[in-house]
Amino acid sequence: MRVTLALVALCLASVAALPEKQQRIVGGSVTTIEQWPSGSALLYSWNLVTYSQACGGAILNTRSILSAAHCFIGDAANRWRIRTGSTWANSGGVVHNTALIIIHPSYNTRTLDNDIAILRSATTIAQNNQARPASIAGANYNLADNQAVWAIGWGATCPGCAGSEQLRHIQIWTVNQNTCRSRYLEVGGTITDNMLCSGWLDVGGRDQCQGDSGGPLFHNNVVVGVCSWGQSCALARYPGVNARVSRFTAWIQANA
């Protein structure tokens, strides 16, 4: 799920509140996996018996899923399963066991810098109209400010709400890096060059939220971001924060 910053009473210091293993698109609408066939629901289990959607990801090839490191820290691979080819979070499609979790070696649990990970499936991910590898941004991908981007996921439709059983999507916009950095300094957050901010700045009401963590952010059908963290969800002043995929292209290609 997406990590949120919580304000400490009567001061501007903040902490990264590590969420429960669960996080929805705010302000979006329902869609289908046929429209976003690279999307995958990542299922977590506390007891290794019952698995439910907790994070999202994007299919990279027949064996690998791109997601966010913070979803998996401290977890054995058998606590996670991968659902591909389904519009629904907890039914349909094909469910794969996870063979390996690869966390970026420079992931920082405090700042959430380098918040990127790859899950390897124990079985082959078949390709069809409901499950297809995503295109990812190259190292020189040019993404300007105020560009329309699309987020998808099964996360909360409002802060503190339950997840959405049906896949949802929302159009938001890229936010200037310096603007995002200065806004988050107000609440103790650190925006690095490895991060990409998106939302509806100074308006709010549209965002990724808890349960959308690890899910892809698309620009012209290319994955440019991986849902990471933010100050609550869909606030006008504070956009959502993603891992910037173009900063990790070589690492993704080497490990996928």
Curated annotation (Swiss-Prot):
Q: Which UniProt keywords apply?
A: Disulfide bond, Hydrolase, Protease, Secreted, Serine protease, Signal, Zymogen
Compartments reported by the entry: Secreted, Extracellular space
Show the active-site residues: 70, 115, 213
Q: What InterPro entries would the database entry show?
A: Peptidase_S1 (IPR050430), Peptidase_S1_PA (IPR009003), Peptidase_S1_PA_chymotrypsin (IPR043504), Peptidase_S1A (IPR001314), Trypsin_dom (IPR001254), TRYPSIN_HIS (IPR018114), TRYPSIN_SER (IPR033116)
One biological process term in Gene Ontology: proteolysis
- Record propeptide residues: 18-24
Q: Name one GO cellular component term.
A: extracellular region
**Where's the Peptidase S1 domain?**
25-256
Does the entry annotate any disulfide bonds, and if so which pairs?
A: 55-71, 180-197, 209-233
Instruction: Look up the domain of life of the source.
Output: Eukaryota
Q: Where is the signal peptide?
A: 1-17
Reactions it catalyzes = Preferential cleavage: Arg-|-Xaa, Lys-|-Xaa
Grouped into one coarse class, the protein's main location is secreted
Write out the function statement from the record.
Responsible for the activation of delta-endotoxin from Bacillus thuringiensis.
> What name does UniProt use for this protein?
Trypsin CFT-1
Organism expressing this protein natively: Choristoneura fumiferana (Spruce budworm moth)
